[in-house]
Amino acid sequence: MQFDYDCFIIGGGSGGVRAAKLASQAGKKVGLAEEFRFGGTCVIRGCVPKKLMLFASDFSQSYKDSMGYGWNVENTNFDWSIFLRRKDEEIDRLEKLYYKGLIENGVHTYKARAKLIGDNKIILNSKKIISSRYIILATGGRPSDSTFEGAQFAVSSN
């Protein structure tokens, strides 16, 4: 049977991107569909933004501590809008690296939602039907709604 791709990945997060690059490096014709942004939860709205927030939040105490070691740090302040802009710039940079890695490895990318419609068949939200010998589902997950006491104060990746 003839297929459009040897391997097609649904999901452009860390797992999907890695699978696509490895399959392509093994000589396979590879396609990947991502409906949101390349990089997945970790890069776009999870690990990376959290680490940037933690990094920025540590400066206040570091400024105070530095005064005991000869530094003269006066009138420090934090500008939330500048932080948000810088965080978004870093996430954009990382997303571009994920995308560039796919392109450099010869992976055909689709900025689309993909859905299985049968054995070896996928339909994109553009109504394009794609066939693939192998299909990898790398769609990640979603946090569940929390029902514990104090849940209204919790923040999820979504």
Which residues does each predicted region cover?
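N-terminal Rossmann-fold NAD(P) dinucleotide-binding loop
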Residues: 16-17
